[in-house]
């Protein structure tokens, strides 16, 4: 798995000193240069067993993304994910929002102020490598704050994770045409 805990929980730390992508830059594209600058923040965090949560480069007050993965949180049963021109539009995140519709889970794509983390019951990163990697807590050292989400994945994350895995592994019907069967490979 992408994170050592797999579909367990991983702690994260907010980094306000390094920007993953420049405003009006190429953050929305899969370009190596977008991630090279973030190594200065991710390597020391990973040595401490932490993932990194990056904020918007312009104001440093809105959640952007988790290292190389998208962020989402659950607030009162609503799946909330950042809307930003500086993050890669994740296929996994789009798939999870589609599954939210299937499962009648409301979802929003909008700017998320850091302070809103205190109102969320669940938080996770999502992307190709991790599918969903839930977040146990987010430490904000600059504000001397910690936001806790529990030591086990929450109910919405579990529901979405299992729905996605069931489609990927053929245990549930793929009504969206996401899977492609390759024969004679």
Regions found by a protein language model. Give the residues of each.
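Helix-start/capping segments and mature chain N-termini
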Residues: 1-185
């Amino acid at each position: 798995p992408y994170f050592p805990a797999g579909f367990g929980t991983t702690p994260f730390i907010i980094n306000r000193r390094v920007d993953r992508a420049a405003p009006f830059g190429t953050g929305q594209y899969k370009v190596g240069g977008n991630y090279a600058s973030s190594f200065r923040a991710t390597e020391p965090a990973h040595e401490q067993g932490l993932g990194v949560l990056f904020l918007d480069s312009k104001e440093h007050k809105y959640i952007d993304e988790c290292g190389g993965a998208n962020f989402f949180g659950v607030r009162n049963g609503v799946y909330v994910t950042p809307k930003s021109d500086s993050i890669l539009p994740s296929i996994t995140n789009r798939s999870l929002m589609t599954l939210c519709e299937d499962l009648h889970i409301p979802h929003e794509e909008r700017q998320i102020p850091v302070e809103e983390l205190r109102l969320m019951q669940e938080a996770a990163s999502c992307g190709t490598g991790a599918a969903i990697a839930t977040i146990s807590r987010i430490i904000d050292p600059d504000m001397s704050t910690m936001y806790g989400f529990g030591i086990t994945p929450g109910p919405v994350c579990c529901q979405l994770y299992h729905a996605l895995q069931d489609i990927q592994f053929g245990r549930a019907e793929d009504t969206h045409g996401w899977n492609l069967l390759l024969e004679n490979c």
